[in-house]
Amino acid sequence: MYSYKKISYQMEEVMSMIFHGMKLVKSLESSLPEKPPESLLTSLDEIVKTFSDANERLKMLLEIKNSETALNKTKPVIVSVANQMLMQMEPGLMQEYWLRYGGSTSSQGTEAMFQTQLMAVDGGGERNLTAAVERSGASGSSTPRQRRRKDEGEEQTVLVAALRTGNTDLPPDDNHTWRKYGQKEILGSRFPRAYYRCTHQKLYNCPAKKQVQRLNDDPFTFRVTYRGSHTCYNSTAPTASSATPSTIPISSVTTGHSVDYGLAVVDMADVMFGSGGVGTNMDFIFPKNDPS
């Protein structure tokens, strides 16, 4: 089965052949009055052969594309042993594969997959975006990494349209406030994966996290994976004693050292001033420490 890169490479070759044929036509046009019949015949043969080769190559690519489209519609998704091993090593690496082709991952602990309609803003207008939402559990034979993710709570993956204006690196606002704490390159992916946690994690011990990554063949669509549920809205407003860590190192006045409040002060400021979304947190005021 041809990959997207192979088809793109073949199309570049076809376009190169077409441009070469056009150059031959222009060359013949400029020297047409002076060419003898023998030379004219040779030039015409070369032009015809060039365009004929490009035509045949293009027909072959269209046949491959049509056959793969028909195969994907009629054939169920089959997981090879190599893909199963890859999913065990990095479960998030194969999520795009399942979301795109609608495969069932019941053997990996998935309980349900369903389609939902999301409204996404695209250049000032609204359009319907069909998103595949995957709710996952965990199997008894999962790896240690999968068991750790089970402890983080319910997992949900959704596809959302990327912003076309403003800071296009940020996913659309989902009515929660987030702090980015990491980013890494993923094997087999063109775009890095960003990691976010709830802004109120330190203050309210909120466990909600999410991962954001662009799709390989559609850079204008984000795959967002949510882990855990927000508990910060169920908590009461913090008091001065609860906002300050119990183990704050306080030195005497003569030492000249100040009190280190750390991230708790930053999170308290987020609550006091209110963050409007993922792009409006207090990172611009307070420096961000290394993620835990």
Curated annotation (Swiss-Prot):
Ranges where the record places region Disordered: 133-155
Residues in the DNA-binding region annotation: 167-235
Name the UniProt record assigns to this protein: WRKY transcription factor 55
GO biological process: regulation of gene expression
Location within or outside the cell: Nucleus
Family as reported in the entry's similarity comment: Belongs to the WRKY group III family.
Keyword tags: DNA-binding, Nucleus, Transcription, Transcription regulation
GO MF annotation: an example: DNA-binding transcription factor activity
Function (record text): Transcription factor. Interacts specifically with the W box (5'-(T)TGAC[CT]-3'), a frequently occurring elicitor-responsive cis-acting element.
GO cellular component, one term: nucleus
InterPro entries found in the cross-reference section: WRKY_dom (IPR003657), WRKY_dom_sf (IPR036576), WRKY_plant (IPR044810)
